[in-house]
Amino acid sequence: MKIENFIPQTYQDTLEQVMLSLDFPWFYHSQTSAYSGNDLATGNVFLDNNTEDKPQFLHIFYENGNPTSNHFGLIQPMIYLLEQKIGKTFSNMFRIKANLLYQDSSYAKDMHNIIHIDTPSIDDSYKSFLYYVNSSDGDTLVYNETVKDKPKCLTIKTKNTPEKGTGLFFDSDVYHCSTPPTNTKARVVINFVLKETQNDFR
């Protein structure tokens, strides 16, 4: 589900200004999705002939049941706004992190970073929400298949070009991946992985 104009313009601008400022801490990671041989065997990641993974920078807001960032308060209201937008509530935050991919003008058009799922759990109650902090190139590819399908190959469902203020909401066991920007200097997203409660309030 694509959600346009997810938050007010002033909130969008604040997030972009803070997260792209010199004061915001980013941490280098050599892969977009760390994996082992076991992850390949279980289907947590999926590699194909078009996989060319690039480094990225991370900022973890929340993990292992606790906030891990002084900036957690900046993004926490987005969870409540998401609940209002989709008419669902969330009982648990699995992980919230930001990813920054920097420009790579040599990156081939049809390539992509590692295809992965956001949680290895087969529990359907886990949901992912990707929020685009800035407008850029570097599409997000979302596939039709889930880890439960145990696919031999994947088919693309949607290609989503990052647009500031827009979000994508989908099941956390759906395969997806990013691509680095080739024309813009940076591509910044916030990735929420949340556990949905059984009953909604619509």
Language model region names:
Residues 1-90:
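Non-heme Fe(II)/2-oxoglutarate
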Residues 68-190, 194-202:
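Catalytic core of non-heme Fe(II) oxygenases with the double-stranded beta-helix
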